[in-house]
């Protein structure tokens, strides 16, 4: 549950977390500092944070940490204890992939299986922010086109930590190698996209199937009025049980579900459909989503 203390609610800000050892994080931070006026805030002793800045318009906080992002379980409580309650947590981060694809990515966090090697807890999902993920990804896409940046702009599936967060959160990333992490143009694009974030409610789905980069879900997010919360790729579906789906629906505030049908085994489709029916969620086909929710201009 998020804190309902009026003082904390009024003081809650969109909080951007920048990690000292993360080159992309520092690149994004440099551009955030250049794009807005910021004032330093005093930190209480032993807060665990290196520095905190607040934007002159009072909308954002920028928090420096010395550790990497994925192990920041309980960060929302730590921020609150330091008098810095968050309305939304955005991890400005690098993305690494074996394929070394140049990319700008957005995703929420969670562990579908009993493994939690990269932070978080097994079988636990963080609270997602579908409106924020949509607005940031759409602005990344727009700016990449304007600036002629030939990067993939994509939604990733739910993965890694932190998961122990009751405040909505997301990752905004530059991928996938050191060369890209320090490039000025991607850093500026991610920073600008973060600063245009919207929390206005949008029709939201949970997604099942597809690969790590959730291509069909990305297309629907960019081309219609909907967004996605948690997404589970085809290679994780064996771990997706009723408890995890219930978590995904609740922590995405989802109204319906979407299947990348061709990528899913029929047994998984049937099993997950039955669970969703029990939870009162319809599965909409891509054609139904496009017809009902139209296209973004």
Curated annotation (Swiss-Prot):
Metal-binding in keyword set: yes
Entry's EC annotation: 3.1.1.96
Signal sequence coordinates: none
Enzymatic reactions: a D-aminoacyl-tRNA + H2O = a tRNA + a D-alpha-amino acid + H(+); glycyl-tRNA(Ala) + H2O = tRNA(Ala) + glycine + H(+)
Names of the cofactor(s): Zn(2+)
Superkingdom per UniProt: Archaea
GO molecular function: D-aminoacyl-tRNA deacylase activity; zinc ion binding
Cofactor binding notes: Binds 2 Zn(2+) ions per subunit.
Alphabetical UniProt keywords: Hydrolase, Metal-binding, Zinc
Pfam families given in the database record: tRNA_deacylase (PF04414)
Top-level EC class as recorded in UniProt: hydrolase
GO biological process: D-amino acid catabolic process
Family: Belongs to the DtdA deacylase family.
NCBIfam families, A to Z: PRK03995.1-5
Function: D-aminoacyl-tRNA deacylase with broad substrate specificity. By recycling D-aminoacyl-tRNA to D-amino acids and free tRNA molecules, this enzyme counteracts the toxicity associated with the formation of D-aminoacyl-tRNA entities in vivo.
Oligomer and partners: Monomer.
Name the record gives this protein: D-aminoacyl-tRNA deacylase
Native source organism of the sequence: Methanosarcina acetivorans (strain ATCC 35395 / DSM 2834 / JCM 12185 / C2A)
């Amino acid at each position: 549950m998020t804190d309902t203390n009026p003082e904390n609610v009024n003081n809650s800000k969109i909080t951007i977390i920048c990690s000292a050892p993360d080159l992309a994080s520092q690149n994004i931070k440099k551009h955030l500092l250049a794009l807005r006026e910021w004032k330093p805030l005093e930190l209480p002793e032993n807060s665990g944070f290196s520095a905190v800045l607040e934007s002159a318009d009072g909308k954002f906080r920028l928090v420096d940490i010395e550790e990497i992002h994925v192990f920041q379980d309980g960060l929302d409580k730590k921020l609150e204890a330091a008098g810095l309650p968050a309305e939304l947590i955005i991890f400005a981060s690098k993305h690494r992939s074996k394929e070394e694809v140049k990319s700008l990515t957005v995703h929420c966090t969670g562990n579908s299986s009993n493994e939690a090697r990269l932070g978080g807890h097994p079988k636990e999902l963080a609270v997602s922010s579908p409106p924020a993920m949509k607005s940031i990804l759409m602005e990344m896409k727009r700016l990449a086109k304007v600036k002629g940046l030939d990067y993939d702009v994509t939604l990733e599936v739910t993965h890694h930590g932190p998961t122990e967060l009751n405040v909505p959160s997301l990752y905004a990333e530059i991928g996938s190698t050191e060369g890209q992490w320090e490039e000025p143009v991607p850093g500026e694009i991610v920073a600008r996209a973060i600063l245009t974030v919207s929390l206005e409610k949008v029709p939201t789905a949970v997604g099942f199937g597809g690969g790590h980069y959730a291509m069909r879900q990305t297309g629907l997010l960019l081309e219609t009025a909907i967004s996605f919360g948690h997404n589970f790729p085809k290679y994780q579906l064996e771990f997706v049980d009723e408890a995890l789906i219930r978590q995904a629906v609740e922590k995405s505030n989802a109204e319906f579900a979407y299947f990348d049908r061709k990528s899913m085994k029929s047994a998984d489709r049937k099993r997950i459909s039955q669970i969703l029916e029990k939870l009162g969620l319809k599965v909409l086909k891509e054609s139904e989503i496009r017809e009902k929710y139209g296209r973004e201009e």
